Amino acid sequence: MTSSSSNRPFSHRSPNTFLTYPQCPEQPEIISQRIWDLCSHWTPLYIICAREAHRDGNQCLHALIQTEKPVRTTDSRFFDIDGFHPNIQSAISPNKVRDYITKEPLALFERGTFIPRKKSFLGNSSKGNSDKKPSKDEIMRDIISHATSKQEYLSMVQKSLPYDWSTKLQYFEYSANKLFPDIQEEFINPHPTSEPDLLCNESIKDWLQPNIYQADYGTRKRSLYIVGPTRTGKSTWARSLGRHNYWQNNVDWSSYNEDTIYNIVDDIPFKYCPCWKQLVGCQKEFVVNPKYGKKKKVQMKSKPTIILANSDEDWMKEMTPGQLEYFEANCMIYVMQPGEKWYSPPELPPTEEV
């Protein structure tokens, strides 16, 4: 069970949510109604809330809410009520949680019909008194209903369907990622614009506003192509603009992140860049075939790509006339001038007069 007090990124997914509000003076009925309203999106079916007294004289409220669809949130403050922050847990055994709540309540409120945890198929097939062996569909339905995390889901599959787990692990990992998606951590720019003091040409500033800084996915973006010498700071500048996918040497679609603003293709020869038209053209949806992986649909939301190339691997020199026409129509082309840099040179200390 995952507590909201963890320092790790918070994630909660469960149809049975157990909440504890320390030192909360509100009535169980009032708290129950507030929790019921908070969970309205997932269709509440049952709630019980009780006040408990501790030996030190303090009181707390315990609540169990059951919903038709699993409550899903990455906001650790989602269940906060009037400044009172609860401990949030997935009630793996709602029967035991309900027994605990109703043990010695000072006040209690209940609404709806309690749903006991369904008897799990897991491990029952080996018992001699089992009515019949459950089907794989029944086993997977049971696992999906009870799993509360990616790790628990995969562990239950491994225990219940060992052969399928060993031969189809990739598919189970895919479904686990869909059921329990990773939490997007807060983006910390590894290349802030002030370290070093980065700068760019005025014409590129005009490109930045509509294509990077404006989150209008209804209009089709334009990409940016920069060609010039090495060690000029163009990669550092490109990576300073915000959250992005970064590819060097090859385009690895298995690491593609949809929650980005733009893509960067850095020092990859034209002939080794698959789907270059889709990237340059900021196409909204297309299918790619990652190496050693299954085909996947990429939904770009018209995401621009910044292509960085050194002069000796200029993409435009490798293109056919038709390819170059498409490239120029969908991409701003910027050729660096001799001696041009993407950062301000450090100030030299004043020299002492002799």
Swiss-Prot record:
Protein name, as recorded: Replication-associated protein
Cofactor, how bound (note): Divalent metal cations, possibly Mg(2+) or Mn(2+).
GO molecular function: ATP binding; DNA binding; endodeoxyribonuclease activity, producing 5'-phosphomonoesters; helicase activity; metal ion binding; nucleotidyltransferase activity; structural molecule activity
Active site: 100
Keywords, in A-Z order: ATP-binding, Covalent protein-DNA linkage, DNA replication, DNA-binding, Endonuclease, Helicase, Host nucleus, Hydrolase, Metal-binding, Multifunctional enzyme, Nuclease, Nucleotide-binding, Nucleotidyltransferase, Repressor, Transferase
Span of the annotated motif RCR-1: 18-21
Predominant place of localization: host cell
Region Oligomerization, annotated ranges: 175-187
GO cellular component, one term: host cell nucleus
Residue ranges of the region described as Transactivation: 251-269
Extent of motif Nuclear localization signal: 291-302
Superkingdom of the source species: Viruses
Compartments where found: Host nucleus
Classification via PROSITE patterns: CRESS_DNA_REP
SUPFAM superfamilies with a match to the protein in the record: Origin of replication-binding domain, RBD-like (SSF55464), P-loop containing nucleoside triphosphate hydrolases (SSF52540)
Domain remark text: There are 3 rolling circle replication (RCR) motifs. RCR-2 is probably involved in metal coordination. RCR-3 is required for phosphodiester bond cleavage for initiation of RCR.
Organism: Maize streak virus genotype C (isolate Set)
Family, as annotated: Belongs to the geminiviridae Rep protein family.
Residue positions of motif RCR-2: 60-65
UniProt keyword ATP-binding present: yes
Listed cofactors: Mg(2+); Mn(2+)
Binding residue positions for a divalent metal cation: 52, 62, 104
